[in-house]
């Protein structure tokens, strides 16, 4: 490299750094130099890119996280438009991972996105990961997959944020954070707790070390001749509101940011919004 080209490269790098600072410097002012650097350097995994996980991934990209792994096997459908950030007329039929990766590239061009078109199960986890995760966000709607993620995270000490069911909820302000042991009014997380205790040796009393995002709001049952309710986070049967699903996703992202910015803290913030 000639002195001239080296100088040009240095200028380009300086311009890129300045651009990133303009985009994401607000986080530095909030979390301080060290916390900001931790967030920027983090590798965060989001499992499930529906009405919750898609907003989580977007929030992480807009917070300057430099490495994301996005895991989901589904394609964008018209029924996703009311609650999923990557669901647009122009993205119908695309893999959710690809549609969201393209969106993230426009938000944070320097973000390294690994798009993994798979559903998590005991046969492929953690093999789906190409590198160590600093935090995993479980926004999937399958209890077996949630148990695989939670058991692995508890065994290896990887910070995990597990999200409960958002379908049938209307009160976004009632979303809260608690240890899995203290979660109520969420059958999916209750089933996860039972699986961890019965199949993975989790204690019957005391904290379980799994940070959960959930709501104690009673579920509003589908009106009229709606399809059968399946209790899942992806809202097939229950009605769904983006105001609620996105709030779940944003709270999960906030927990992940706290965990990577302040790794000594246990479980991020607790309590209601």
Where are these regions (language model features)?
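N-terminal charged helix/coil linker that caps or initiates catalytic domains
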Residues: 1-45, 78
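Conserved N-terminal Rossmann-fold NAD(P)-binding element of oxidoreductases
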Residues: 46-48, 71
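Hydrophobic/small residue at the entry helix of a nucleotide-binding pocket
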Residues: 52
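Conserved SAM/SAH-binding loop
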Residues: 116-125
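Conserved S-adenosyl-L-methionine
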Residues: 61-67
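Glycine-rich phosphate-binding loop and adjoining beta1-alpha1-beta2 segment
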Residues: 67-108
């Amino acid at each position: 490299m000639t002195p001239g080209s080296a100088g040009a490269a240095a200028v380009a790098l300086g311009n890129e750094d300045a651009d990133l600072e303009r985009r994401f410097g607000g986080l530095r002012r909030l979390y301080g130099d060290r916390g900001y650097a931790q967030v920027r350097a983090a590798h965060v995994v989001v499992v499930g890119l529906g009405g919750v996980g898609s907003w989580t991934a977007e929030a992480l990209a807009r917070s300057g996280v430099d490495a994301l792994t996005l895991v989901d096997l589904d394609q964008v459908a018209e029924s996703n438009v009311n609650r999923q950030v990557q669901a647009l007329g122009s993205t119908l039929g695309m893999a959710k991972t690809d549609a969201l990766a393209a969106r993230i590239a426009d938000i944070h061009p320097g973000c390294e996105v690994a798009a993994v078109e798979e559903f998590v199960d005991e046969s492929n986890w953690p093999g789906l990961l190409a590198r160590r995760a600093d935090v995993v966000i479980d926004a999937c709607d399958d209890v077996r997959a949630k148990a695989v993620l939670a058991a692995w995270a508890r065994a290896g000490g990887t910070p995990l944020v597990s999200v409960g069911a958002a379908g049938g909820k209307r009160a976004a302000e009632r979303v809260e954070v608690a240890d899995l042991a203290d979660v109520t009014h969420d059958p999916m997380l209750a089933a996860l707790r039972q699986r961890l205790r019965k199949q993975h040796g989790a204690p019957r009393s005391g904290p379980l070390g799994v940070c959960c995002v959930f709501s104690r709001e009673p579920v509003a049952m589908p009106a009229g001749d709606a399809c059968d309710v399946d209790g899942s986070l992806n809202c097939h049967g229950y009605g769904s509101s983006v105001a609620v699903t996105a709030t779940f996703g944003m709270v999960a992202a906030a927990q992940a940011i706290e965990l990577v910015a302040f790794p000594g803290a246990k479980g991020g913030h607790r309590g209601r919004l």
